[in-house]
Amino acid sequence: MTIAAAEALTRCIEHREIFHDEMLHLMRLLMRGELSPQIASALLMGLRVKKETVGEITAAAQVMREFATPVVTPNPQDLLDMCGTGGDGSHTFNISTTAMFVAAAAGVPIAKHGNRSASSSSGSADVLEALGANLQLTPEEVAECVAATGIGFMFAPAHHGAMKNVAAVRKELGVRTIFNILGPLTNPAGAANQLMGVFHPDLVGIQVRVLERLGSRHVLVVHGKDGMDEASLGAATMVGELKDGVVREYEIHPEDYGLSMMSNRGIKVSNREESRALVIEALDNVDGVARDIVALNAGLAIYAGNKADSIPEALALAFETISNGSARAKLEEFCAYTRKFQK
């Protein structure tokens, strides 16, 4: 079913939903660059003001997946992504990227989808390069990396070439649009399990239901009530969980797991080198907020990756993996393996 751009804009103005097939059609036009910049920007802003629905986001994510360059692995049902929306303005170090090494060392196969910094001081790609990883990998090399090390990193621009058709409009608008929440929904390896941080509390329930419709297996969508797009030590964390086909929403508190409430001030960074230093500090088991917040998020990842039956069990495994040095060893193994492919 198609829809004229004018009708779609009218729906947005009147706060009425654009139906699934109609949204598929509009999104394909956007991704092919077949809408004028004026219509494209009006549509993106109309959706933002109206507030995108679960159905609209689901359809848009399906089209982005359709246009993506895939990474083919034998068992996408076992893979876990740890990709957040970003945009929380907290300027903390790369917590989920660090937690990735802990989860992988605990046996969770990781297919992480990431990018350079947009609003933070250091994006996942920035800090991984600072740590010595080579990110210029083909899809086949990423798949080989997953098979050999348990981790693959997919640099978003290399897998979403069609995004160039909306890049100029997004840049000129300079505000958040639906594309800011689509990235974590469009893993090129089709990872069925996910730990996703979101920048706004409303997105917890929205994103987990989108992933339910997209066929995900086990998902945790989190938002720290202090504003972080991670599980936080500074406040309670809102969680939306999809497991066994059922969505639940609840809160977790650091003290529930024997962790101290701590301010995030000590983990703020201004560049990728400062972030790199905290990544190493956390993985070297230095007592403090960096290690504990990484362990908390890694615990959630281990649980979402189905290597533990509960969050407390997963958190204990995360701390063990850090303290015995296997998480730090996983970092070195991953970086060394990616450098094999340097041209």
Swiss-Prot record:
The keyword S-adenosyl-L-methionine does not apply. Its EC number is 2.4.2.18. GO terms for cellular component: cytosol. Keywords: Amino-acid biosynthesis, Aromatic amino acid biosynthesis, Glycosyltransferase, Magnesium, Metal-binding, Transferase, Tryptophan biosynthesis. GO terms for molecular function: anthranilate phosphoribosyltransferase activity; magnesium ion binding. Pathway: Amino-acid biosynthesis; L-tryptophan biosynthesis; L-tryptophan from chorismate: step 2/5. Anthranilate 2 binds at residue 170. Mg(2+) 2 binds at residues 229-230. Anthranilate 1 binds at residues 84, 115. It comes from the Bacteria. Mg(2+) 1 binds at residues 96, 230. Its cofactor is Mg(2+). Binds 2 magnesium ions per monomer. InterPro entries: Anthranilate_Pribosyl_Tfrase, Glycosyl_Trfase_fam3, Glycosyl_Trfase_fam3_N_dom, Glycosyl_Trfase_fam3_N_dom_sf, Nuc_phospho_transferase. 5-phospho-alpha-D-ribose 1-diphosphate binds at residues 84, 87-88, 92, 94-97, 112-120, 124. One of its GO terms (biological process) is L-tryptophan biosynthetic process. It catalyses: N-(5-phospho-beta-D-ribosyl)anthranilate + diphosphate = 5-phospho-alpha-D-ribose 1-diphosphate + anthranilate. Homodimer. Belongs to the anthranilate phosphoribosyltransferase family. Catalyzes the transfer of the phosphoribosyl group of 5-phosphorylribose-1-pyrophosphate (PRPP) to anthranilate to yield N-(5'-phosphoribosyl)-anthranilate (PRA). This is Anthranilate phosphoribosyltransferase.
